[in-house]
Regions:
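Catalytic center-proximal scaffold of phosphoryl-transfer enzymes
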Residues: 1-229
Length: 229
């Protein structure tokens, strides 16, 4: 299982490796071992789910995967790997990967139905189905959007998107500075140092509303920023 899921070695190649060493192990046998191993690990997975939901902050995202020969789906169709991680200051750190055949919001809603903390995500509306969580926008996604909107070779003096990008960089730099401090100290530092940067950022975002020169990417990012505020 480590070779398959950590090292990326598929079972047919593992079969060949064992065969070179004079050991006959069919892919069917290896697959059955993986299935049985997954059953043994289920209690641990349930405990990870409980620890994840007990926290105060969860970051979530989903990405496209393709599964060959999946029942009821064409090989070229898209499935999803949903990824959930504890906030960086949680006592128990959990990294939870959940495969699902689609991007429906019912999947995070089911896993996080008892979660009452802050859920940090991109702007995908499917996360709105998580019933008790407080949605929070992800600054890493926002930063990437500003970066993608920057013309090649742009600087903060020539591109509106670059200005947004630099605001995000300032916020990330401040967060790195606060790392290791007591939660109360971090709160005070954020109020003293981060809040003025955020106020300036939101004022700048509002100014884009009145700027007809902004390109479509910049306008799109402005709307995303305002909706995630």
């Amino acid at each position: 299982m480590t070779q398959k899921y950590v090292d990326g070695i598929p079972l047919y190649r593992q079969e060949q490796i064992w065969k070179r060493d004079g050991i006959e192990l069919s892919r069917t046998t290896l697959a059955n071992w993986v299935i049985q191993g997954a059953k043994w690990l289920k209690p641990l997975v349930r405990r990870m789910e409980a620890s994840l939901v007990e926290g105060s902050v969860i970051h979530a995202d989903e990405t496209v995967v393709q599964v060959h020969k999946e029942e009821g789906k064409a090989n070229a169709s898209e499935s999803r790997m949903w990824v959930y991680t504890s906030g960086p200051y949680e006592r128990r750190q959990v990294r939870y990967f959940e495969y699902q055949p689609d991007r429906s919001g019912k999947h995070p809603a089911a896993l996080l139905k008892e979660f009452e903390g802050r859920l940090v995500t991109d702007g995908y509306a499917g996360y709105d189905q998580v019933p008790k969580a407080t949605r929070c926008g992800c600054w890493a996604h926002m930063r990437r959007k500003w970066r993608e909107a920057m013309p090649r070779g742009a600087t903060s003096s020539t591109s509106k998107a670059a200005i947004g990008y630099e605001y995000c960089n300032k916020l990330f730099a401040l967060e790195r500075k606060y790392d290791g401090y007591h939660p109360k100290q971090r709160q005070e530092m954020r109020q003293a140092q981060t809040e003025p940067v955020l106020d300036a950022y939101w004022s700048w975002v509002e100014s884009l509303t009145r700027s007809p020169a902004a390109n479509w990417r910049t306008r799109s990012n402005m709307r995303a920023a305002k909706s995630g505020r």
